[in-house]
Amino acid sequence: TAGGKEKGNPYHVYLYKVNFNGNNLICLTPEMGSHSINPSSNWDYFVTTYSTTKTAPKSILKDRDGKNLFQLSSSNTDNLKSNGWQEPLEFNVKARDDKTDLFGLMYIPSFYDKNDKYPVLNYIYPGPQSGSVGNYSFMVARRDFQALAELGFIVVAVDAMGTPGRSKSFHDAYYGNMGDNGLPDNIKAIEQLSKKYSGMDLSRVGIWGHSGGGFASTAALLRYPDFYDVAVSSSGNHDNRNYEADWGEKWHGLLEPLGIDSKDNSSEYDVKKTNYDIQANQLFVENLKGKLLIAHGMLDDNVPPSNTMLVVDELIKANKDFDLILFPNKRHGYGDMSNYMMRRKWDYFVKHLKGLEPPKGFSFN
């Protein structure tokens, strides 16, 4: 299977056959969409199930040459739409270099009016092992994107440079600078979309993410304080010197001391003078202007809570106001407290981007 060869969305995956010498590449699943393949044990036959973000899945039995033998199943979105389902808007914009194509999804309120103005929410997961969308097959819902849209926001998720599924150069776009997080592409995408959708209010922009997205959303508020106004950041690996070595070394490179004043050959160095400084959120807290809600599980055995404490410590030292949620006895995900975190996120955006007071005592339980 491979993507990027057929016309349209490069994230759509198709099945091919090819000779051992690399010649005579033939697509066996030309139907537009992302294909999931289930072969027979001898590969004489296979079933492909394919869909797009807007079209529901279909399953077809094919022979090894790609000939359609039988349509096994077909579905549509009629019942979903009759119950108020909103399909996501798939978009294609240019990256920071004004040349590279970027793809993503946008969610707008069911009551969208181009003459009204809506705050923008940017969901981010920078990877680099995956992107904010990644999978462009059909899903009834993606996280709480449409729910947030129904609160009066426009939600944008973009697969920025630095994420997989494209070329190696695309994936390596900011190797050695994990603090980049694809944020220049996210900003560029939102700015371009606002020219097409006049309802997008770029004077009110929020961002959120979890884990790597927590790292990226905090970085957004600290590095681009004139663009992003509010961030909700959970379980972020805010300084990859304090995360798994195989992660930082894979995407940022080996830790190297910089600016050592000592004239001897000592191994001592200043931890604030290394090639990892450019990705460490706690070193940028002086730039905080907007509203920041930061959260972490106290038993997180993926991203140690010390990552968030580094940022908290520097925020306090810099006399900055922020909001903090700590989840006792919770790991990287918050389990039965996840709905609480989602409610707090919704409330935070409603209060600080829409200027409204959230309903008291609301619970998803």
Give short role names for the model-derived ranges.
Residues 12-13, 25-116, 140, 146-150, ...:
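Non-catalytic accessory segments flanking enzyme active sites
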Residues 11-14, 133-136, 236:
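Beta-propeller blade termini and top-face loops
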Residues 102, 119, 204:
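Alpha/beta-hydrolase fold active-site loops
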Residues 108, 116-127:
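Short beta-strand element of the alpha/beta-hydrolase
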Residues 128-130, 155:
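Serine-hydrolase catalytic-loop signature spanning alpha/beta hydrolases and amidase-signature enzymes
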Residues 1-10, 130, 134:
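Short, conserved, GDST-rich strand-edge loop motifs in beta-rich repeat architectures
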Residues 123, 141-151, 157-365:
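Active-site-proximal cap/loop segments of hydrolase catalytic domains
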